[in-house]
């Protein structure tokens, strides 16, 4: 895929990308009290589930590893590209101009 094709795809799916980001931002995923099936608490388990749900909707095969982490993959073959990230947050605190759990767009 050429760079221009990638840029066009991003431009064409901007609203979908922002909608999916909004779904994730809305979840308070700060570290919580571990519970059955939720090793990092309820919030991180919820955001992991939501992220994997979004990946499913986008056509990826997803795997949840006991709510410790998960991954999404597409295609077959021996060569892979891996991108690591995290979905948990630090406590939101009270010094926000906007609601920290609501995606805000300016401009």
Which role fits each region the language model picked out?
Residues 1-8, 75-83:
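Short charge-dense sequence patches
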Residues 8, 12-14, 59, 74, ...:
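Short, well-ordered helical secondary-structure segments
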Residues 10, 25, 47, 89-90:
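Hydrophobic aliphatic residue packing
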Residues 20-25, 73-74, 100-101:
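Short hydrophobic/aromatic-rich motifs at helix boundaries and adjacent loops
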Residues 34-79, 102-103:
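A non-catalytic alpha/beta surface segment that caps or lines the substrate-entry region
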Residues 80-107:
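Active-site metal-coordination/substrate-binding segment of hydrolases
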């Amino acid at each position: 895929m050429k760079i221009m094709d990638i840029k066009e795809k991003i431009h064409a799916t901007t609203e979908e990308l922002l909608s999916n980001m909004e779904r994730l931002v809305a979840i308070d995923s700060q570290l919580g009290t571990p519970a059955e099936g939720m090793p990092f608490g309820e919030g991180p388990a919820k955001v992991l589930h939501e992220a994997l749900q979004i990946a499913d909707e986008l056509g990826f095969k997803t795997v949840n590893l006991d709510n410790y982490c998960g991954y999404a993959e597409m295609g077959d073959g021996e060569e892979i590209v891996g991108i690591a990230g995290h979905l948990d947050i630090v406590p939101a605190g009270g010094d926000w101009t906007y609601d920290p759990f609501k995606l805000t767009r300016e401009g």
